[in-house]
């Protein structure tokens, strides 16, 4: 029996300034424990397919609780990592 690759799906959110779509993201095993399903914000990326898969190893460095800028053609797509359990005390959720 073939095993399906498991992915976490970002939740659907609405924002006044930008559209946020659900995206399938492949998480390494060690990150799956600490990272909440990612929120992907679509900003100024008309060529971005909202059903396209994004891989964390395409990101230049992984910084929890910070906005990340995707390289090359994903440069306008920002990813916010959220901890599953306790949020960092210096993280203000009202800014998201």
Curated annotation (Swiss-Prot):
Gene: 29
Lineage summary: Viruses, Duplodnaviria, Heunggongvirae, Uroviricota, Caudoviricetes
UniProt organism field: Acyrthosiphon pisum secondary endosymbiont phage 1
Name used for this protein in its record: Putative protein p29
